[in-house]
Amino acid sequence: MAPSVGILGERDQGQDVRTNNVTAVMAIANIVKSSLGPQGLDKMLVDDVGDVTITNDGATILRQLEVQHPAAKVIVELSQLQDKEVGDGTTSVVILAAELLKRANELIKNKVHPTSIITGFKIAAKEACTYIKEHLAISVEELGREALINAAKTSMSSKLIGPESNLFSQIVVDAVESVKMTNLMGDTKYPIKNVKIIKSHGQSTLQSQLIRGYVLQTQRCDQQMKTRIEKAKIALLDFNLNKFRLQMGIQILVNDPKNLEKIRFKECEILKERCKKIIEAGANVIITSAGMDDVATKYLVEAGVMGLRRVDKHDLRRLAKATGGTIVTTLATPEGDEVFEASYLGECAEVYEEAVGDNDCIFFKGTKRANCASIIIRGANEFMVDEVDRSLHDSLCVVKRTLESGYVVPGGGAVEIALSIKLEDFARTLGTKEQTAVAEFCEALNIIPKVLAANAAQDATELVSKLRALHAASQSSDDPAKKELKNCGLDLSLGKVRNNVKAGVLEPMVSKIKSLRFATEAAITILRIDDMIKLNPQNEELPQGRH
């Protein structure tokens, strides 16, 4: 440790800092390494209040960790970024970034300057992304809907729902396709936020289902209300339907006790008048984000209107978008009157209540404006339902990215090995100091297939060697039959090498490209650091006499 010069804290410099950073990053990568791939293992995480999470989703594992080391925090943020941008590949991006750092650190120990390594890594990442787009990408149009289902299955293969991937892949693809929309620029988008996920304990995961409509996990305000309404006109309110109360601070002087009853009566009359105006506008379903008292409920029952109260504002906004309704925050007009117009109402074909497990749910089908979908997840217990939810989120993101980018690549380590062989040849063409960095970059790419094979209890060295031989033959030959070998990847269940495009092991091209870019950028960010100053925490002394 270097002596501090007027600094109230610790200062580390040079190789000590780099070794320290690499050790911290490798520690994080080793936590998630065994969870990679279809044979990956799960992690049990217990937080400070004793809540248990069982998962093998890299982003979820790292989100639960309370990481102290600043370099390790960069890697945790890297997995969150991958989760946000792509939704899948969070584990592999962390493992790749850690391997790049480890190899870069070895080069620095051998007197290669960090700037040369950084330049080499940037060149290698750029060349790798170009090669994926030009040689490895396969158009979704060529493979059809089957490509989407296979991409979803590949995402699920490492998750708890892997054995039921035939059911869930169909659900996911149908859900994403049902929320298809075209924005103002004319681009086709698949906003998966419009896919509502409802979790309900009980029965098997095979009883999970897709609902082409919107589902709310709530029930009617009163059991006397209708359970089904056809041609629903929906009023969306962001205020309560309780008895009218005067504001705090207003005083009323009552001379006659009989007038107290008149005040109570008037309070109820104002509420009834509000309900009447909404119903006269044509509403037969009233949804509010606040309360609805017995007076309003009784009036709605008599009018044959379904009422829902305390609905989450997030759900209210989604319903407004789907049904074409307007969220009304007040009935008051600038003139001081109270008005509710028919144009505020949303529309859908039918609204009905149905029990799902122990919970009652309200279903909205045939929405007027935007398409929406809901997935009802069933499962034995809370842990299982939560893990299915996380798995479906990843798969929804994968299918969305596949549809929006229009390209997939073979999985099972095929891309990493192909890039490794390509970059080896590319490194030999460089006559600069960056050659060693590019060579180490292509060696680092081998970590993904090696970890995949090791987690599946296979001989990683033998399998990766076979795979490298096939990809080398593919890239060095003009024979169309040998060119097809570029799609070869690992078959982890049998411990063989196979054509993963024919086997249906596919991943979105965007996922691979962003993984490479993010991992390289994170490694470069940490590699640039050669000095770390950690200030001592300030001791705030309490004034005398206070404890």
Curated annotation (Swiss-Prot):
It is found in: Cytoplasm. The keyword Zinc does not apply. This is T-complex protein 1 subunit alpha. Keywords: ATP-binding, Chaperone, Cytoplasm, Nucleotide-binding. NCBIfam families: chap_CCT_alpha (TIGR02340), thermosome_alpha (NF041082), thermosome_beta (NF041083). Molecular chaperone; assists the folding of proteins upon ATP hydrolysis. Known to play a role, in vitro, in the folding of actin and tubulin. SUPFAM superfamilies: GroEL apical domain-like, GroEL equatorial domain-like, GroEL-intermediate domain like. InterPro entries: Chap_CCT_alpha, Chaperone_TCP-1, Chaperonin_TCP-1_CS, Cpn60/GroEL/TCP-1, GroEL-like_apical_dom_sf, GROEL-like_equatorial_sf, TCP-1-like_intermed_sf, TCP-1_chaperonin. GO terms for cellular component: cytoplasm. Its main location: cytoplasm. GO terms for molecular function: ATP binding; ATP hydrolysis activity; ATP-dependent protein folding chaperone; unfolded protein binding. Belongs to the TCP-1 chaperonin family. Heterooligomeric complex of about 850 to 900 kDa that forms two stacked rings, 12 to 16 nm in diameter. It holds the Pfam family Cpn60_TCP1.
